[in-house]
Design a protein with these regions (language model features):
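Structural signature of hydrophobic alpha-helical transmembrane segments
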Residues: 1-8, 85-96, 138-146, 176, ...
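Hydrophobic mid-bilayer segments of alpha-helices in multi-pass membrane transport proteins
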Residues: 3-13, 23-69, 87-99, 250-260, ...
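Juxtamembrane and boundary regions of transmembrane helices in multi-pass small-molecule transporters
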Residues: 4, 23, 161-164, 168, ...
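Hydrophobic alpha-helical transmembrane segments
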Residues: 6, 28-32, 91, 126-131, ...
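Alpha-helical transmembrane segments of multipass membrane proteins
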Residues: 13-17, 35-39, 134-135, 219, ...
Length: 468
């Protein structure tokens, strides 16, 4: 049965990787393989439980006679809910942060972006919009930032070819900026939530690689742009029934929202509660502020104008379902012992985290950066560390400790490696939907640049590991 579960999940990964050909939604596939895997697991639960948790199961029985019903109760209460809780922590954090962005956007807190980007110099515009994207993505999340910046760019640049180039640069900047912090992408968030790294150490290590992964391709893309471009400053959205906030009120709301997100790592270190609790606290505070400053409006929950296309907002919901499905899928692989076997094979035949990092990047380019990150991170992220007990090399084992180099390589390669092909990230898929970009065009014009920039970042990480 373990072979069947593994086969189903591998087939699901292949279907997700070829989603642009099959037109089958990744979120649907992820939820299917995640749920079916657990259904098959619990149907043959006795063998798996006695293999992975014999002591815990016998202790839970407390002398009662074991049977199929008892083992199902044990799995549901002591195994399955543990993984559901971990997945829910990530999903709730994403829900909170994306709602924060929606509240800020509906109140015009991001209206300052378009005016500061106004210029007819194409290269200046490229650096401005990617810099803003990089900074915002590091503080919010790369998916929401990409969606917001693509909408702004689409309204300002009338030329389709230039929109395609600028859109690709936005995706690169968003993914690189998101990889810089633990709250900037689902990959870093999941690793941070699992306790394998800390926020400050993670950002310090990835600062230079992420900057180079953004600057190198952007510098090259700037050479293919004309000197000047036609620019259309989008009209400010009508907010007669939306909001009557003045500039200082919008700045206050922006400070509460963004400043609150900055405080979440500190909140986690002080309270040891899951980061999503801090995100929900920030959301509730911002919500209260929103109600206070907009108390004079009637029907304040009905907005006149939606800033983002519904197809992209629908993608945000799909992302949360995708995250849940992938985390359930990698969890069932862990419970059947697949990751433990793979870790032992890697320790004996590969024994190099750099080889794993390169493989991670290439897999992420065709699969999905979050699915790839969770897959390679789950190989060694076992609560009891059983997969490393047989490894005698202390230096090698230390790479898998808290803040070990392995976790940074997996996070960086999965996030930036997803830029090699446009289909490797949710941000890239959002760009494909909005600008109708084909994968072949992207590979010819941007994919090679993304590959080079990713390898440059890996080289920097290698240099840092040698120096430290």
């Amino acid at each position: 049965m373990a072979f069947i579960i593994v086969a189903i999940i591998i087939i699901g990964y292949v279907v997700m990787a070829t989603g642009n050909i099959t037109n089958i939604n990744k979120s649907a596939v992820a939820m299917f393989v995640g749920t079916v895997g657990w259904v098959l697991y619990i149907c043959f639960g006795t063998d798996f439980v006695m293999s992975q948790h014999p002591g815990d199961y016998l202790s839970w029985l407390s002398g009662t006679v074991p049977n199929s019903v008892a083992v199902k109760h044990f799995i549901a209460e002591n195994i399955f809910l543990l993984y559901v809780g971990r997945a829910a922590e990530v999903v709730l954090f994403l829900l909170a942060t994306m709602t924060i962005v929606e509240i800020l956007d509906n109140n015009g807190c991001f209206d300052f972006i378009a005016p500061i980007l106004r210029t007819r110099k194409s290269r200046k515009y490229l650096w401005l919009i990617t810099l803003v994207t990089f900074v915002i993505s590091a503080n919010l999340d790369n998916i929401t930032t990409t969606t917001m910046m693509l909408v702004v760019m689409h309204q300002m640049v009338p030329n389709r070819r230039l929109r395609m180039l600028y859109g690709c640069a936005i995706v690169l900047a968003a993914n690189c900026g998101g990889a810089l912090t633990v709250i900037g992408s689902p990959e870093g968030l999941a690793l941070w939530n699992n306790g394998v790294l800390t926020a400050t150490n993670y950002s310090m290590w990835l600062l230079v690689p992420c900057l180079l992964a953004w600057v190198v391709p952007t510098l090259w893309l700037s050479r293919s742009l004309p000197e000047r471009i036609d620019m259309e400053l989008p009209a400010m959205p009508y907010r007669g029934d939306d909001t009557n906030l003045n500039v200082w009120q919008r700045v206050m709301m922006l400070f509460v929202g963004i400043g609150g997100l900055w405080f979440i790592p500190t909140f986690h270190n002080i309270t040891k509660l899951s980061p999503f609790v801090g995100a929900l606290c920030v959301l509730s505070l911002l919500w209260i502020v929103n109600e206070i400053v907009n108390h004079r409006l009637m029907n304040a929950d009905q907005m006149i104008q939606r800033r983002m296309p519904r197809v992209l907002q629908y993608g945000v919901i799909q992302l949360m379902l995708f995250v849940m499905g992938i985390m359930l899928a990698v969890a069932v692989m862990q419970e059947i012992g697949a990751w433990a076997w793979l870790a032992q094979w890697l320790d004996h035949h590969v024994r190099s985290i750099w080889v794993v990092a390169v493989v991670t990047g290439f897999v992420s380019s065709v699969l999905d950066n979050f699915a790839t990150c969770m897959t390679f991170a789950s190989i060694y992220a076992l609560p009891d560390g059983d997969t490393l007990q047989q490894v005698s090399d202390a230096a090698y084992r230390s790479q898998f400790d808290v803040n070990g180099l392995y976790w940074k390589l997996v996070a960086y390669s999965s996030a930036v490696g997803g830029n090699i092909f446009l289909i490797g990230s949710a941000s890239g898929l959002a760009l494909m939907k909005l600008e109708r970009i084909r994968v072949g065009w992207y590979i010819r014009n941007v994919g090679v640049l993304s590959l080079v920039s990713w390898l440059v970042g890996l080289l920097v990480l290698w240099g840092l590991s040698v120096l430290m």
